[in-house]
């Protein structure tokens, strides 16, 4: 009797020992320590991991998750996550993830500074030349591969910016940059400390190696509200104005403003003449696009909440097209009389500019994403369209069959407005993710060619803005990528 009672008590004690969270924690620590102490030949599977995987992620994936605790892969033990209360609690999953991402970013920056990037094994200039001589590569493929090789060897260099107000350069942060058609000017929007935005134009014609120096022309009168969307506009001549969609502030409604580039001193010497600022009362504009199509000459479009507004700058005539969702992205086709729109609902549709806004005949094409569309780009032959959304999907659509023919993997986006940069001459696609990494894909086979970490720590306020061109600084310029982040401008030029 006493023996059975003793065995029952022993079983009960062992069961309560296992159910107590403190003992579970200690057992997990012991198991973790024992795993860490195993010899190297027992962990051979871990050596096969991809080099892009962070050490923190690899460490936490092999240990069980305990509610209310997190595992530190460096110290190899669990720590308690305190519930929300008045005291400051630095131990959160977000802070842990941020720390892992920062350590990965610093590691990639060190790798970039230490050696040149190689796109893939056996991919070098000598092998490409030999294949071309043997007839295995035609001229087109050889040019594409040569561009890819030079792209993989781009090195980061800081650009020295000069201005009439040097003190502002140290405090104002870049919000976005936008190169003009010839890539000899860069329109900039900078966030100022007191609130609002300041605009400037950087002359890129002086952007030459080895000394990368540029001058920023500013017009301090135009310190204004938050910019929702911006594009170059060709009213008097090519890229004579900048079209801005501004948010409303207090009792001041939102508007679309045509800002003459001539108002920035010496922005385009010899061509620009003093111009007038034109402002159109268009509240709540999410996106804008300028038309170079002869069917909509001197016109621009704005994407609003549940409608598209087409405005003629010269006559002031307007056409309104009703939609079922907010229009977040727009672009005019050049040859076909079409305006493509991307919506918050995930729908992409085209407006036939020859039709009026009466009836439903103006919807020419309809495509669908699973999330809000943030960017649409029409390829030069106007038979394909590139679109990205807030789920991080980038798809290439065939407009003739309305089917997705290619998808570009790796982009990161959850809720931000992030543009796409398509460069068919170089055969590449460039996009900056919400994780602050700039990714470059091959346009032809969707292969990820390069991932560039941000020079600044990743944050929502410091997502880089980029501009890629085959001729940075004008017709005699070299191909390269400009990246604006924080107060700095960087150039990734072909070596």
From Swiss-Prot:
Compositionally biased residues, Basic and acidic residues: 24-34
InterPro entries assigned to the protein according to its UniProt record, in alphabetical order: CUL4-DDB1_E3_ligase_receptor (IPR052254), WD40/YVTN_repeat-like_dom_sf (IPR015943), WD40_repeat_dom_sf (IPR036322), WD40_rpt (IPR001680)
SMART domains reported for this sequence: WD40
WD repeat ranges, renumbered to this chain: 368-407, 410-451
Keyword entries, A-Z: Repeat, Ubl conjugation pathway, WD repeat
Transmembrane segments: none
Biological process according to GO: protein ubiquitination
Biased composition (Low complexity): 51-62
Cellular component terms per the entry's GO annotation: Cul4-RING E3 ubiquitin ligase complex; nucleoplasm
Pathway assignment: Protein modification; protein ubiquitination
Regions of compositional bias (Basic residues) in chain numbering: 1-17
Segments for region (Disordered): 1-66
Subunit organization: Interacts with DDB1 and CUL4A.
Function: May function as a substrate receptor for CUL4-DDB1 E3 ubiquitin-protein ligase complex.
Protein's recorded name: DDB1- and CUL4-associated factor 4
Gene name of this polypeptide: DCAF4
């Amino acid at each position: 009797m006493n023996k059975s009672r003793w065995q029952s008590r022993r079983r009960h004690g062992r069961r309560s020992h296992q159910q107590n969270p403190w003992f579970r924690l200690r057992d997990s620590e012991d198991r973790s320590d024992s795993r860490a102490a195993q010899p190297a030949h027992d962990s051979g599977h871990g050596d096969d991991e991809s080099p892009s995987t962070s050490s923190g992620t690899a460490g936490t994936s092999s240990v069980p998750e305990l509610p209310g605790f997190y595992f530190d892969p460096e110290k190899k033990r669990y720590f308690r996550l305190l519930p929300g209360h008045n005291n400051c609690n630095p131990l959160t999953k977000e802070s842990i993830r941020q720390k892992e991402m920062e350590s990965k970013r610093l590691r990639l920056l060190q790798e970039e500074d230490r050696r040149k990037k190689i796109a893939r094994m056996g991919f070098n200039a000598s092998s490409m030349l030999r294949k071309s001589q043997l007839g295995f590569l035609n001229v087109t493929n050889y040019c594409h591969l040569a561009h890819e090789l030079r792209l993989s060897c781009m090195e980061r260099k800081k650009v020295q910016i000069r201005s009439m107000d040097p003190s502002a350069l140290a405090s104002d942060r870049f919000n976005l940059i936008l190169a003009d058609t010839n890539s000899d000017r860069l329109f900039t929007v900078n966030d100022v400390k007191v609130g609002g935005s300041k605009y400037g134009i950087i002359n890129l014609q002086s952007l030459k190696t080895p000394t990368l120096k540029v001058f920023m022309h500013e017009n301090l009168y135009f310190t204004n509200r938050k910019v929702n969307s911006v594009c170059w506009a060709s009213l008097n001549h090519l890229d004579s104005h900048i079209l801005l969609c501004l948010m409303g502030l207090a009792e001041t409604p939102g508007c679309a403003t045509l800002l003459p580039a001539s108002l920035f001193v010496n922005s385009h010497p010899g061509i620009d003449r003093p111009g007038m600022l034109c402002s159109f009362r268009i509240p709540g504009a999410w996106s804008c696009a300028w038309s170079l199509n002869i069917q909509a000459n001197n016109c621009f479009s704005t994407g609003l909440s549940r409608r598209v507004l087409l405005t003629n700058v010269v006559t002031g005539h307007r056409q309104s097209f009703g939609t079922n969702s907010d229009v977040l992205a727009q672009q005019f086709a050049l040859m076909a009389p079409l305006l493509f729109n991307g919506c918050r609902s995930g729908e992409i549709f085209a407006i036939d500019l020859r039709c009026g806004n009466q009836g439903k005949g103006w919807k020419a094409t309809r495509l669908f994403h699973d999330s809000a569309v943030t960017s649409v780009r029409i390829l030069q032959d106007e038979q394909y369209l590139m679109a990205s959304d807030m789920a991080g999907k980038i798809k290439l659509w065939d407009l003739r069959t309305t089917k997705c023919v290619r998808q570009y993997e790796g982009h990161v986006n959850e809720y931000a407005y992030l543009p796409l940069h398509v460069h068919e001459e170089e055969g590449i696609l460039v996009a900056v993710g919400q994780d602050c990494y700039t990714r470059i894909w091959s346009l032809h086979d969707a292969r990820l060619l390069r991932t560039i970490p941000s020079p600044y720590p990743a944050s929502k306020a410091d997502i880089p803005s980029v501009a890629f061109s085959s001729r940075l600084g004008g017709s005699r310029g070299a191909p390269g990528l400009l990246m604006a982040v924080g107060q700095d401008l960087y150039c990734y030029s072909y070596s």
